[in-house]
Amino acid sequence: MGLCVAATTGTIVAWIACGTLCFCYTRLIDGRNKKIWLLTLFLLALTGCIYTRTWADAVAVLGMLLLWLAIKVHTDGKYHPTWKDRPDGRYVRSAAPIAVITPFIMPDRCGANILFDESVEITELDRYVRAKRRAGMPSFGMTHAIIAAYVRTVAKYPAVNRFVAGQRIYARDEDIAVCMTVKKEMTKDSPDTVIKVHFHPGDTIQEVYDKFNAAVLSAKDEMENSGVDDAAGILTSTPRLVLRFVVWLVKLLDYFGIAPKFLLELSPFHGSVYLTSMGSLGIKPVYHHLYDFGTVPAFIAFGRKRRAEEVHDGEIVERKYMDLRFNLDERICDGFYYASVIKYFLRLLAHPEILDIPPETIEKDIP
């Protein structure tokens, strides 16, 4: 009886020690406590077990010691992936309690979306586009300007680059993944595919132009052999039950944040924002739904240019506008933050010359 009690006590102590170590470890490497004294005190406490010659606990001490020696403390001041992080995002540990609870109240992205529309006067933007084409960017268009404006907006308001997965909030930090559907030719029978282009918050309009054009050209050249289409083709060739199981399995892995990185990169449903150009189709922008699968928290659609007559200084003047429609996941940031994001985004489109130079500072999201 005494041996059983001793063994049970030793097991409980070992589990408590392991839990304490994990707690100290996560607090140390996620930046909430940058001193090593927590681990040092814990090691001293375990060393006491060896001093008292309680050999049943000595094995646990050795195991804990090996774990302690395996802990890698980073002193470069940068964030390093740790517990609860995903391959495509960092877990936001200091989010407000209401923000943490919200994904449990509204678990689906389509049930947490907000719709917003805005118009931007594009006289200056039109001039800017024409100037860029004359300056050696022959294919420069509104799409490049909108992407660059969004990238610069993330540099100032990084919380808009978050996403919700597995009912947790994650931050992409300096990786901005822009998704867009492209067609090889503007005909109804031409195949289409999805491109995903990665940008950095410090990118200028020139870097955005180069990265986006390279991705579009690559997609059009390899339209018949794109990774997204190949993967979809393999899945659709299987029986429905198999396909349903595969999709369920991918969703399960994605929920727990353990889906392989290559799969997340292939998926058109995982990214920072999805853009769609209705202007190239000659129609007004639509309110496009968000996807419950994946991580994309924002959908931005922009339509054809339109003219409007207005009264200015007692005279009727004609101005050109472009309409934009947003579908946003309200769980990643609050309404005040979103309002600031939209206003800054529109200001950049009204004064696109700002995008020619790198941002003075790149704001960091909360830990």
Regions found by a protein language model. Name each.
Residues 3, 9-17, 21-367:
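C-terminal catalytic/motor cores of large multi-domain enzyme assemblies
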